[in-house]
C-alpha cells in the first residue's frame, strides 16, 4: 500500500510566543494518539510553529485504515430472548448493527450474560478522515487570551488568515465558517512578511520546509534556535566576548521570528556604572536583548538582538535598538541615583501606603509580623547575639525596596535592589545578602539561601503569608493556587532541610495562628488546616524530590493500618516539630530497603503490630514494667520476649533523643528470633487466649514491639516486596 504525506497549516496574525510553544506541545500529545484511535499508524508526526503559523506534517501515512473486526456488546441475554425467540430489544439491536439475530453470540461478563456481534468493518480512506481530524486538532487547542475574530464565534489567540490542507499534492476539502468569513483549505501558504510577502504555492507536503525556507521562513523551531545560538556566538566573538544566553529568553525569541538575524548593538559606557543586575534586566526582560561579557565575565557596553526583518538592514536595526536601550538605561540611572539619596530604612514609613492583602493590613504590618516570626525562629535556633542582630535588621529591611523608584519601575529587581541599597546605606554584608536571599527559592529549581539571615527571614515571610492567607480561608485547590502557597510551604521545608535548621514548625504555626486570631477575632484558627497542608507537602517532597518510595513515606508520616487516630495525631505533631527527623527517618528506611535489611525486621514488626491493634496499649507506652504482669507470663517464649523488651526499652528512649535509628533497628533485628519462637516455636503461645489477663498481657508485649518500631515508622504502611 503506497504511503502518503499529509500537511495541515494554520496561518495567522502574529501569535504570542508562549502560545506557539504551548500549541506545539499540545499537538505533540494530541495528534499521535488521535491518529492511533483511527487505526492510522504513520511513520512520523512532525509539529512546527512560527509567529504566523502552526503546522503538522505527517509522513508515511497509509492510504486507508486496515479492515478490522469490531466486537459490539448488546443487551443482556435475559432481555434479548424470551422462550428462545428474540425480543424487540434484540431485533432492534440486530437492525442497528445490520446483522441477523442468528449472528448473536452469548458471552459471560462480570455483570452477567450479554449478547455480542462481530462486525467486519472496511477501513476508511485516509483522505476522508484527515479533514475532520485536522479541524478537531485545531479546535482542541487551549490557551490564555483567546479572542473572537471576524464577526463569528470562532476563538483563537489571533485571527486565522489561511489554511493549507494537502495530502501529497492534492488539496483536501476543509472549511472554516466564521460569520461572514469563510476560510477554505488550499495549497497556498505565505512567506516571510518582509522577505517574501507573496503567497507560496506548495507543490507537495514533502516540500513544505524547503519551499518555505526559500520564502524566508524557517518553520522548524529547533532549526531557528540553532541558528540563533550560532549567530549570537559569532557576533559576540567579534568583540572577543561571549553572549549570556538565558534559556527563557532563547525560548521566547525563538518564537518571535520566522527568519532570525542576530544584530550587534551598543550603548554608552557610563551605564556600566549601574549595578549589573539593573543593566541586564533592562536588556533581557524589557528589551529581549542578549548581554555580552568579556573573557573575565565583565559586562560590555554591547548587546545582541534577534531581528525578524531584512538582514541587510542590520545597521538600522542596531541603531534603533541602541536608542531605545539608552533611554531605558538613562531612566534606570536616574532611579538608582535618586533612591541612593536616602538610606534604606527611610523607606519603611512608605510601606504603610502599600496594601499586602485585603484584611491583612499594609506591607509595614507584614514586616512587623515577619520580625516577630523571625525572632521566634532565632530563639529556636539559639543564635548568637551578632546573628540575632543581623536577622532583626534583615527582617526589618527586607521589603523596604518595594517603594523605591527602581523597584516600582522594575518589579523583578525586588530584593536585588534591597541588597544594593543596604550596602550603600552602610548595612553589613550579611544583612544585604539576607535581603536578597530571603526571596529564594523563587521557583522549584532556584538556588536556596546560603546565609542564616536570608534563611530565617525567608521562612518567616512565607510562614506569615501561609498563616494569613489560610486564616482568611483562601486555601489552594487542586487547580488553583493564586498565592503560591504550595511553593511557599515547600520552600520552608527545603530551606530547613538544606541548612539543617532544627526548627519546631508546629510551635511556629501555633504561635502564628494564635497571633492571627488575636488580630482577627472574627476568624477561626487555621492551625489544623495548616498542619494537614504541611503534611501533604512533606509527602510530596519526600517522594518527588528525595526519591523515597511511597510506602516508606507513608510509614514515616504515620499513614499505616496499624496506627489509630490518637497515635496519628500525636505522630503528626512530632513530624511538624522536627522536620530534620522526618527526612532522616525516610532516608534511613529507604537505605534499609535498598540494602535488604528492612526484610530482616519487617515480618516481626508487622505481625506484632497487626495483633497489637486488637489491644488497648497506647502507642506512646515504651516501658514494659507498668503494663506487663510478670506473674502472668506462663510460657518460656513469652518470658523471653519480656526480657528482650526490658533490654530494648532504654535503647528506645535514648534513640528518641539521639535519632540513632541504627541502634533501634539492630535491637529489633536481634529480637526477631525470640518473637518467631513466641509465634511459631515449640513453646509458642496463643495470643488471643480466653483468659482476659493472659490475652491482655500478650497483646501488650506485641504492642511494645509496635511502639518501639513506631519510633522509626509505622510498619503497617510498608508494602512487602517493593
Curated annotation (Swiss-Prot):
Keyword Coiled coil tagged? no
Localization per Swiss-Prot or TrEMBL: Cytoplasm
GO MF terms here are: arginine-tRNA ligase activity; ATP binding; glycine-tRNA ligase activity
The enzyme's first-digit EC class, named in words, is ligase
Source taxon at top rank: Bacteria
Q: Which UniProt keywords apply?
A: Aminoacyl-tRNA synthetase, ATP-binding, Cytoplasm, Ligase, Nucleotide-binding, Protein biosynthesis
**Which InterPro entries does the UniProt record give?**
DALR_anticod-bd, Gly-tRNA-synth_bsu, Gly-tRNA-synth_heterodimer
Q: Pfam families this protein is in? A: DALR_1, tRNA_synt_2f
GO biological process assignments: arginyl-tRNA aminoacylation; glycyl-tRNA aminoacylation
Which PROSITE patterns does this one have? AA_TRNA_LIGASE_II_GLYAB
Its assembly, as annotated, is:
Tetramer of two alpha and two beta subunits.
Q: What family does the Swiss-Prot or TrEMBL record give for this protein? A: Belongs to the class-II aminoacyl-tRNA synthetase family.
Q: What is this protein called?
A: Glycine--tRNA ligase beta subunit
- Supply the source organism for this entry: Synechocystis sp. (strain ATCC 27184 / PCC 6803 / Kazusa)
**What lineage does UniProt assign to this protein's organism?**
Bacteria, Bacillati, Cyanobacteriota, Cyanophyceae, Synechococcales
Amino acid at each position: 500500500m503506497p504511503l502518503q504525506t499529509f500537511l495541515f497549516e494554520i496561518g495567522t496574525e502574529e501569535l504570542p510566543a508562549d502560545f506557539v510553544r504551548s500549541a506545539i506541545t499540545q499537538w505533540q500529545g494530541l495528534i499521535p494518539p488521535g491518529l492511533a484511535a483511527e487505526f492510522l499508524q504513520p511513520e512520523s508526526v512532525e509539529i512546527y510553529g512560527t509567529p504566523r503559523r502552526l503546522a503538522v506534517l505527517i509522513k508515511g501515512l497509509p492510504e486507508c485504515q486496515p479492515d478490522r473486526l469490531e466486537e459490539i456488546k448488546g443487551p443482556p441475554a435475559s432481555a434479548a430472548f424470551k422462550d428462545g425467540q428474540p425480543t424487540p430489544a434484540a431485533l432492534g439491536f440486530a437492525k442497528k448493527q445490520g446483522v441477523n439475530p442468528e449472528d448473536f453470540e452469548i458471552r459471560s461478563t462480570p455483570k452477567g450474560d450479554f449478547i455480542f456481534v462481530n462486525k467486519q468493518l472496511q477501513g476508511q480512506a485516509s483522505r476522508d478522515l484527515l479533514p475532520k481530524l485536522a479541524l478537531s486538532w485545531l479546535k482542541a487547542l487551549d490557551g490564555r487570551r483567546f479572542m473572537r475574530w471576524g464577526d463569528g464565534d470562532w476563538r483563537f489567540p489571533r485571527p486565522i488568515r489561511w489554511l493549507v490542507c494537502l495530502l501529497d499534492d492534492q488539496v483536501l476539502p476543509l472549511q472554516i465558517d466564521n460569520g461572514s468569513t469563510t476560510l477554505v483549505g488550499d495549497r497556498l501558504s505565505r512567506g516571510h512578511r518582509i522577505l517574501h510577502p507573496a503567497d507560496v504555492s506548495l507543490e507537495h507536503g514533502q516540500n513544505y520546509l524547503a519551499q518555505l525556507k526559500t520564502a524566508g521562513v524557517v518553520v522548524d523551531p529547533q532549526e531557528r534556535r540553532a541558528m540563533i545560538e550560532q549567530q549570537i556566538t559569532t557576533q559576540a566573538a567579534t568583540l572577543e566576548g561571549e553572549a549570556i544566553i538565558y534559556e527563557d529568553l532563547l525560548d521566547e525569541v525563538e518564537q518571535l521570528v520566522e527568519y532570525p538575524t542576530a544584530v550587534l548593538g551598543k550603548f554608552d559606557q557610563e551605564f556600566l556604572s549601574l549595578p549589573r543586575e539593573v543593566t541586564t534586566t533592562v536588556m533581557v526582560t524589557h528589551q529581549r536583548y542578549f548581554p555580552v561579557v568579556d573573557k573575565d565575565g565583565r559586562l560590555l557596553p554591547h548587546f545582541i538582538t534577534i531581528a525578524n526583518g531584512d538582514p541587510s538592514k542590520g545597521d538600522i536595526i542596531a541603531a534603533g535598538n541602541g536608542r531605545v536601550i539608552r533611554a531605558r538605561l538613562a531612566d534606570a540611572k536616574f532611579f538608582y541615583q535618586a533612591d541612593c539619596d536616602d538610606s534604606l530604612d527611610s523607606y519603611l514609613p512608605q510601606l504603610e501606603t502599600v496594601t499586602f492583602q485585603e484584611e491583612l493590613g499594609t506591607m509595614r504590618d507584614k514586616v512587623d509580623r515577619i520580625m516577630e516570626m523571625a525572632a521566634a525562629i532565632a530563639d529556636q535556633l539559639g543564635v548568637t547575639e551578632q546573628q540575632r542582630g543581623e536577622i532583626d535588621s534583615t527582617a526589618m529591611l527586607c521589603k523596604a525596596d518595594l517603594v523605591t523608584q527602581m523597584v516600582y519601575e522594575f518589579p523583578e529587581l525586588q530584593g536585588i535592589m534591597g541588597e544594593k541599597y543596604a550596602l550603600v546605606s552602610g548595612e553589613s554584608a550579611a544583612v544585604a545578602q539576607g535581603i536578597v536571599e530571603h526571596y529564594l527559592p523563587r521557583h522549584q529549581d532556584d538556588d536556596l539561601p546560603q546565609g542564616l539571615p536570608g534563611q530565617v527571614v525567608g521562612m518567616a515571610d512565607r510562614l506569615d503569608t501561609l498563616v494569613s492567607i489560610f486564616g482568611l480561608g483562601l486555601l489552594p485547590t487542586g487547580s488553583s493556587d493564586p498565592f503560591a502557597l504550595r511553593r511557599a510551604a515547600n520552600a520552608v521545608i527545603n530551606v530547613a532541610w538544606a541548612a539543617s535548621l532544627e526548627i519546631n514548625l508546629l510551635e511556629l504555626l501555633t504561635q502564628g495562628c494564635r497571633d492571627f486570631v488575636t488580630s482577627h477575632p472574627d476568624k477561626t484558627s487555621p492551625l489544623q488546616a495548616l498542619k494537614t497542608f504541611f503534611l501533604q507537602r512533606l509527602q510530596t517532597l519526600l517522594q518527588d524530590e528525595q526519591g523515597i518510595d511511597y510506602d516508606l513515606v507513608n510509614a514515616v508520616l504515620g499513614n499505616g493500618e496499624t496506627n489509630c487516630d490518637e497515635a496519628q495525631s500525636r505522630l503528626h505533631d512530632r513530624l511538624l516539630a522536627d522536620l530534620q527527623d522526618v527526612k532522616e527517618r525516610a532516608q534511613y528506611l529507604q537505605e534499609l530497603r535498598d540494602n535488604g535489611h528492612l526484610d530482616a525486621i519487617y515480618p516481626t514488626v508487622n505481625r506484632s503490630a497487626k495483633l497489637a491493634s486488637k489491644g488497648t496499649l497506647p502507642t506512646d507506652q515504651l516501658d514494659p514494667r507498668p503494663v506487663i504482669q510478670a506473674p502472668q507470663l506462663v510460657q518460656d517464649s513469652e518470658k523471653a520476649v519480656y526480657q528482650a523488651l526490658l533490654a530494648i526499652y532504654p535503647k528506645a528512649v535514648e534513640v528518641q533523643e539521639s535519632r540513632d535509628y541504627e541502634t533501634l533497628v539492630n535491637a529489633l533485628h536481634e529480637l526477631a528470633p525470640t518473637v518467631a519462637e513466641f509465634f511459631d516455636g515449640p513453646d509458642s503461645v496463643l495470643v488471643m487466649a480466653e483468659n482476659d489477663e493472659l490475652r491482655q498481657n500478650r497483646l501488650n508485649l506485641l504492642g511494645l514491639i509496635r511502639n518501639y518500631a513506631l519510633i522509626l515508622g509505622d510498619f503497617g504502611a510498608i508494602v512487602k516486596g517493593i
